[in-house]
């Protein structure tokens, strides 16, 4: 099957720092034949020189990333690989400082996630601590609407004793309890014991863990359910913009993922908040010209008369007859995860929704609600603290597109960030639209 016939899945790899995400992805790409021996040899030589033998596969990812960053193409420069059943795009190779921020903007576009946890003594516990990213990433994945998760229990070669079934079971139990509390269907989640370093259970079944009878990592990827394109295609068009390139001979090329609706060559589109628009001249995906783009497609497209200065990351493209909503203010159900003291009216976190990030002030805290039942506990509370859920009204300080969650899920959920941390997560229940004049280029 060619990549056209295979269903396409966007994958995000999450988990605590140093739990082996990059090494696992590197080894996976290598085992599936998406990295040639020559590249690997070169990387190994370089790694040896710098005494980084053990980071062989992680290095590979960084190298691939640098290569791509040097040659900017229209395509969303992501890592791609195929399994027998699917054509995958990894939409964020983790590891950088901005990963949570990227995860918030990227996760809204992921169809599934691989959560990597380390089984090495002390490392799993660090990831699950109050400051741990394992907890934070699982929580964000849930908010961002990712229901399909594969858990890779990594570094099984480093347990005490190595390949310990007891340690594996302990980790699975802890994670199941935590994830169940967040509403994940834990019985549908595969927990695959792997070693990113030795390659155990990535493609080949591990001889070191005969006690494990479940799928390998690649089998677990193939067991994922395909995304429902039909459901999203029926909605009006929404394409959050990730980047805007100037390509010689083509012109301005916004790049993004079609979240809802269908984009065809010849369509008129408008970008909000700026309100500029024009006719779609061409659409490209994975370096190939296409006539129409469906939900889930990562595309670059050229619009007549729209210049690079008119639009930016965070803008959203739609059809002029049903343009994306620019919010004057919006109401949301929020859940507070972290704050050093308390949150009151006037607090201004940065709201990350789809690819946008805009500082927004809390102008009213309407109700405190029970996070489990949604019942109102208190009207007009004076402050909120971690663990509270509430109905809150925000006013964005700059124009921003945000939609009701019920109407456009991918554009109706957000994370609140402050001081480099995720303060809370939320879903939009109502939007008071701002007036924006639409200027279509002839």
UniProtKB/Swiss-Prot annotation:
EC numbers on record: 3.6.5.3
Binding site for GTP: 15-22, 92-96, 154-157
InterPro entries on file: EFTu-like_2 (IPR004161), G_TR_CS (IPR031157), GTP-eEF1A_C (IPR054696), P-loop_NTPase (IPR027417), Small_GTP-bd (IPR005225), T_Tr_GTP-bd_dom (IPR000795), TRAFAC_GTPase_members (IPR050100), Transl_B-barrel_sf (IPR009000)
Residue ranges of the region described as G2: 71-75
A single cellular component GO annotation: cytoplasm
Residues annotated for Mg(2+) binding in this entry: 22
A Pfam match: GTP_EFTU
Keyword terms of this UniProt record: Cytoplasm, Elongation factor, GTP-binding, Hydrolase, Magnesium, Metal-binding, Nucleotide-binding, Protein biosynthesis
The reaction(s) this protein catalyses: GTP + H2O = GDP + phosphate + H(+)
Region feature G4, mapped onto this chain: 154-157
Compartment(s) of residence: Cytoplasm
GO MF terms held by the record: GTP binding; GTPase activity; translation elongation factor activity
Domain of life (superkingdom): Archaea
Renumbered residue ranges of the record's region G1: 15-22
Residue stretches in coiled coil: none
Region feature G3, mapped onto this chain: 92-95
Every tr-type G domain range: 6-229
UniProt-annotated stretches for the region G5: 195-197
Function (record text): GTP hydrolase that promotes the GTP-dependent binding of aminoacyl-tRNA to the A-site of ribosomes during protein biosynthesis.
Family note: Belongs to the TRAFAC class translation factor GTPase superfamily. Classic translation factor GTPase family. EF-Tu/EF-1A subfamily.
Protein name: Elongation factor 1-alpha
Organism placement in taxonomy: Archaea, Thermoproteota, Thermoprotei, Desulfurococcales, Desulfurococcaceae
Gene name in the database record: tuf
């Amino acid at each position: 099957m060619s990549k056209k016939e295979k269903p396409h899945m966007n994958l995000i790899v999450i988990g605590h720092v140093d739990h082996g995400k990059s090494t696992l992805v590197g080894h996976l790409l290598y085992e599936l034949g998406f990295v040639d021996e020559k590249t690997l040899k070169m990387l190994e030589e370089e790694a040896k020189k710098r005494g980084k033998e053990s980071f062989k596969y992680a290095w590979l990812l960084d190298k691939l990333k640098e290569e791509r960053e040097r040659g900017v193409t229209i395509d969303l420069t992501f890592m791609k690989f195929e399994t027998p059943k699917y054509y995958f795009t990894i939409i964020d190779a983790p590891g950088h400082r901005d990963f949570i921020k990227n995860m918030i903007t990227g996760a809204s576009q992921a169809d599934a996630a691989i959560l990597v946890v380390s089984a090495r003594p002390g490392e799993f516990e660090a990831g699950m601590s109050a400051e741990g990213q394992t907890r934070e990433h699982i929580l964000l994945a849930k908010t961002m609407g990712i229901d399909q998760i594969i858990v890779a229990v990594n570094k099984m070669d480093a347990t005490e004793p190595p390949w310990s079934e007891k340690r594996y079971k302990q980790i699975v139990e802890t994670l199941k309890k935590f994830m169940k509390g967040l509403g994940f269907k834990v019985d549908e989640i595969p927990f695959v014991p792997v070693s990113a370093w030795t390659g155990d259970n990535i493609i080949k079944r591990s001889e070191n863990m005969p006690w494990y009878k479940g799928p390998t990592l690649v089998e677990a990827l193939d067991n994922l359910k395909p995304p429902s394109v039909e459901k999203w295609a029926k909605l009006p068009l929404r394409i959050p913009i990730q980047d805007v390139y100037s390509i010689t001979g083509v012109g301005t090329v916004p790049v993004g993922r079609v979240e809802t609706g269908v984009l065809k060559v010849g369509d008129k589109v408008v970008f909000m908040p700026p309100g500029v628009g024009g006719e779609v001249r061409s659409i490209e995906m994975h370096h190939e010209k296409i006539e129409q783009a469906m939900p889930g497609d990562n595309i670059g497209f050229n619009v007549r008369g729209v210049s690079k200065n008119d639009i930016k990351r965070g803008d959203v493209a739609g059809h002029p007859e049903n343009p994306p909503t620019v919010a004057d203010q919006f109401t949301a159900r929020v859940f507070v995860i972290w704050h050093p003291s308390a949150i009151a009216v006037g607090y201004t976190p940065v709201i990350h929704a789809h690819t946008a990030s805009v500082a927004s002030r809390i102008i009213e805290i309407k109700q405190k609600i029970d996070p489990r039942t949604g019942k109102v506990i208190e009207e007009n509370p004076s402050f909120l603290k971690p663990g509270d859920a509430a109905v809150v009204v925000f006013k964005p300080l700059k124009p921003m597109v945000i939609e009701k969650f019920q109407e456009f899920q991918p554009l109706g959920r957000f994370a609140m960030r402050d001081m480099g941390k995720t303060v809370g997560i939320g879903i939009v229940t109502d939007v008071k639209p701002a007036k924006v004049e639409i200027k279509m280029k002839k």
